[in-house]
């Protein structure tokens, strides 16, 4: 979220069982919940301290139109954030199934939402952004690959697990770059979401 106030994020997410956490323990909790509690629909996101005007929420349901309950959960969690903050972005990857996803909302509206896994376009809404083109991603149209597009998608590394991070760096902040950034130490929060 484009904000320097993580407390607003906590309020909008209707946080339960909130605890302070440093980056390491917060990321560990989010990662554990994503892998161990996913089937129980329990999420334990980490809400970061501000980084260059952005607050990260790590460990929320993925953007995946092909799985309706997950998509509804994503919508329910992000709707108040999109309505409140000037810009909201979402990114995801899971290398086991070549899952990649990204989404960008500005001024209360999703401008771009894209998700792909296992050779299938799960979601493709909004126009491709200049930053996606800058990364060499082909402009896919619709929800299915046209003739030759799948091969072109593979050739441009569209499903590379680092693609969402690269795009995050062009849209805002690449989380992979955090260790090299000159940012003040900070404490965030972990919370429980059902």
Regions found by a protein language model. Give the residues of each.
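Short, intrinsically disordered low-complexity segments
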Residues: 18-115
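Generic detector of well-ordered alpha-helical segments enriched in charged/polar residues
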Residues: 7-10, 75-82, 151, 164-168, ...
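Alpha-helix capping and helix-coil boundary motifs
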Residues: 3-8, 66, 146-149, 160
């Amino acid at each position: 979220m484009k904000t320097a106030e993580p407390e607003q994020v906590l309020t909008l997410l209707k946080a339960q069982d909130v605890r302070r956490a440093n980056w390491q323990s917060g990321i560990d909790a989010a990662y554990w919940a994503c892998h161990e509690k996913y089937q129980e629909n329990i999420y334990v996101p980490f809400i970061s301290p501000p980084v260059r005007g952005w607050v990260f929420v790590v460990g929320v349901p993925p953007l995946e139109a092909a799985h309706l309950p997950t998509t509804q959960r994503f919508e329910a969690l992000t709707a108040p954030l999109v309505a409140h903050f000037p810009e909201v972005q979402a990114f995801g990857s899971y290398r086991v199934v070549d899952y990649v996803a990204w989404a960008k909302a500005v001024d209360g509206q999703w401008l771009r939402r894209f998700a792909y896994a296992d050779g299938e376009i799960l979601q493709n809404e909004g126009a491709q952004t200049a930053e996606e083109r800058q990364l060499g991603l082909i402009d896919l149209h619709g929800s299915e690959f046209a003739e030759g597009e799948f091969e072109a998608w593979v050739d441009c590394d569209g499903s590379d697990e680092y693609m969402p991070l690269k795009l995050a760096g062009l849209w805002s902040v690449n989380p992979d770059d955090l260790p090299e950034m000159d940012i003040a130490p900070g404490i965030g929060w972990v919370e429980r979401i059902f």
